[in-house]
Amino acid sequence: MLIDRLSFNRAYLGHGVGLRQKHFARWLSEKPAVDWVEVISENFFARGGRPLAVLEKVRADLPVVMHGVSLSIGSTDPLNAGYLADLKQLAARFQPAWISDHLCWGSHGSRYGHDLWPLPYTEEALNHVVDRVRAVQDILRRQIVRDVDERRVGANSQRDAFHGAGVMVARAEIGKQSNDRPGHAPMVLRIAD
């Protein structure tokens, strides 16, 4: 995995691990030797319950990063306002170091396929994603990390994933500080191979 740091002011968090439900008991009984934890955002959208209680305890000791799997940034459906409201509320509560999701699509006609479908890296798709990234960042009032998987490059692509993602970052002016999002570090692009 290559991490392309587009910002010199993003603090290095050290080594982290994913916090999954099957690990809750261990997290509560012993504190693993890690510097931060990653949570799947959607697993904590509930308004109460054990997952949030565990995350509260973990967050008291460690920074959290949030990684989503359902933003569907590449979909042609309207952005899911309910999803974004839940994500924004969760971020306000736990103040993650960053929020990430996949550069893909997973919904059509307001139905979720529960998969990460590839985007074609074409001018049309890149322009569409840039507009949606900007809209999401405006709603969340913070910049987001896009997770780009080289294995998920759609048919008819005019660019490879690395170049296409780089174009997207440049066009969305990702990496610039904004008066609208004070104090939030610019986007990091995570590329999985």
Q: Can you describe what each PLM-predicted range is?
A:
Residues V148-R151, S157-G164, I174-R181, A185:
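Alpha-helix boundary/capping motif
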Residues R20-K22, I40-E42, V69-S72, H102-C104, ...:
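Active-site beta-loop-alpha junctions enriched in small/polar residues
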Residues L13-L19, D35-V39, V64-H67, A97-D101, ...:
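Hydrophobic faces of well-ordered beta-strands that scaffold small-molecule active sites
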Residues W27-P32, G49-M66, G82-A97, R134-I139:
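Acidic (Asp/Glu)-rich catalytic clusters
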